[in-house]
Amino acid sequence: RRSSELAFPGGMRSEEDVDLETTALRETTEEVGLGPEGVEVIGTLSEVVSRHGILVTPYVGLVPERHPYVPEPGEVETVFQVPVRWFLEDHRARTDEISFHNWHLYVPCYRWQEHDIWGLSAIILVECLNAAFDAGIDITRPPRG
């Protein structure tokens, strides 16, 4: 990810990581100060390839509602929360058409306060919303209306 881009915590697997879940938890600790003891990992989402050709394996976990996040200044500018209900109401600011290899996707861009949630982060978010809440957001077709 580049400076000023919004992203979930994550990074490359290190030699000392026993598996990708360990990587996800380590990166979450390093980037936002949420240690493994504060996360109940509930599963993974589909692997997705970033626009830079990096294979990403998203992990989903439950965290305490009022956890005091501590952003790592060298990596993270801010941490913010958005109510799930807001996404389920589909408050997209726009839809981005993304073509990558043989894929053509219609990805929502959500604007929460001054933050744009788009691209890979939005693709991961939409899969999570569809899996956990049956949101019915289809990114393979243009949005209705």
Give, region by region, the residue ranges found by the protein language model.
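The catalytic Nudix box helix
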Residues: 8-43, 83
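Short, charged/polar surface micro-motifs in flexible loops or helix N-caps
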Residues: 14, 64-67, 85-87
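Acidic pyrophosphate-coordinating catalytic loop
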Residues: 47-55, 68-74, 117
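Charged phosphate-binding loop/patch that engages nucleotide di/tri-phosphates or the phosphate backbone
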Residues: 135-145
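Short aromatic/basic micro-patch
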Residues: 7, 81, 119
